[in-house]
Amino acid sequence: MRPLPRVHAFTDAVLLAAPEFGIRAAAIAAGGPAVALHARARGSGGALLASGARRIMALARPPEAAVFVSGRPDLAAALVANGVQLGSDDLTPGDARRVFPHGWIGRSVHSVEEAKAAVDQGADFLVVGSVYDTPSHPERPAVGLSLVTKAAALGRPVIAIGGITPERAAEVRAAGAYGVAAIRALWLAPDPAAATLAMLSPWMGDA
């Protein structure tokens, strides 16, 4: 597998349907192999997710940004995506591996216990959050940087999510995160390309 990207740009159903989606996706994808675009459209049905994932594939390929699909290892396999990210209500990493054998498989976790279970089930990386309070999940209390550190000690790359901004990326890295994930800080930035590079900055020069 190619190296796991450091910056992960998650979509949602609103973003996938937005007229400017293609322009913003191309700007984020310009970050190249250190960037992954995640097709995610929870609650909207499979058609929007599939069409969005195909659009992302077309936009990401020239700069070689990675493409991940959320919750659908079957779609990830059909598109030959680089990875799949699983929520707590999705298949286990082990079951997803049977459908999607050749790419990265991540699992969203919100506690040390969930992180340990995901590792035991074969997750390649952990999406840990919400690290900070975030409008995306106002009902979910922030887990803080301590969970990032504890999850990283389990030996899997940790992607921190939830309230992540370029200004916070350095402290997240210092806590042990391999990389970060965001929605608003990337997709809704005045300059998505610049925001992506700023988010990536703490990891510049890392292998």
Where are these regions (language model features)?
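A short local structural element in Rossmann-fold oxidoreductases
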Residues: H137
